[in-house]
Amino acid sequence: ALFAVPYTMTDASQVHLVAEDEVGNRAEASFIDKFTPRPITTDTIQLNDAYINKVVPEIMGQSPEVADQGDPVKNYVEINRNLRKKNAATLVDLAHKSEPRFLWTQPFQPMPNAKITAAFAQRRTYLYNGKPIDQEDHLGFDMASVTHDAVPASNDGKVVLARFFGIYGNAVIIDHGYGLMSLYGHMSQLEVKEGQMVKRGQELGRSGQTGLAGGDHLHFTMLLQGLPVTPVEWWDPHWIQDRIARKLGAALPYHP
């Protein structure tokens, strides 16, 4: 099985393997012997009325689960905080339906010729009129290229979401099997449908600035059992070979 340690965890002894038989006998043990806490960087996002009045109506118009707070700034916080949580819960639900087989055989690849403008595990404080109104964690990589650039699939898999998806705007999520997924957000247009099988490098759509995006870019992240994990490791063929393929052996038909 593949599992992820939450990016906020500082003590791996909190992770336990639990076994229980049919009559309720239960055994529990810690099994992680090497763990390095992930540093969380910080950033400040300056909000203005022009940005808020652009993103809030679009998201609320396509997200009926967002309760209108009667004020654009309050609506922004409702989206940034509570819709973000609902989106995260959906990611966990999707993981429960992941294919029980590996759908990929090659290393994952990033968007080509793109500049990274924001990285994984960045704690953002949002300021409006100089005062903090929210704080949330950015859990992916923002990758900017030319406007409406082609967005390729990072690896083979099955499209499990292709629609407007809350804070991510127009988004695609690919299931790579056993709870491993990749997410592509803020796209201007989508070229794939839910249920479709895609190949590594196949165009999924075009970059854009839908959802909470302030400019044209791709928000990309990897997910394991619904938990965001840093894409950097999955882009590294040596990391996959050492941490995944070597341990799984013939169960993973990996060809770096």
Spans of features found by a protein language model:
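Non-catalytic extracellular/periplasmic "stalk"
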Residues: 1-122, 127
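Catalytic cores of peptidoglycan-degrading enzymes
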Residues: 109-255
